[in-house]
Regions:
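Metal-dependent amide/peptide-bond hydrolase catalytic core
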Residues: 1-116
Length: 116
């Protein structure tokens, strides 16, 4: 049983590679520079255990109008997140964006862009 998780730290080189790929895919809508966030994620164990670089990112799924109002009211931290029973992302386009993000990140290694 695991009662605690180590800090999740993105690998710098891998993060730069994923950020570049996200920039090509999503343009100005992509950002891998969120504010630090504390969370209990088992994700941080994978890279350490397997000795591989890891990159953890978030995919926003809140209705843009709800987010804009929360930002205006300075209550963004009260928007329910993924472990809350009140979590209610907009399924579309959230699911499509999440899939595109995963495929884009994987493709950065599996199908790297080449320059002539």
């Amino acid at each position: 049983m695991i009662n605690s998780y180590p800090l999740t730290e993105n690998d710098l080189v891998a993060t730069q590679k994923v950020a570049e790929a996200f920039g090509h895919q999503f343009g100005d809508n992509a950002s891998l520079a969120p504010s630090p966030a504390s969370a209990s994620e088992d994700f941080s164990i994978f890279g350490r255990t397997w000795g591989v670089p890891c990159v953890f990112w978030f995919v926003g799924g809140t209705d843009p109008a709800v987010y804009a109002k929360a930002k205006q009211d300075k209550t963004v931290n009260k928007i329910p997140s993924n472990h809350s029973p009140k979590f209610a992302p907009r399924i579309h386009p959230t699911l499509e964006t999440g899939l595109q993000a995963m495929l884009t990140a994987a493709s950065a290694w599996l199908c790297p862009r080449t320059t002539a």
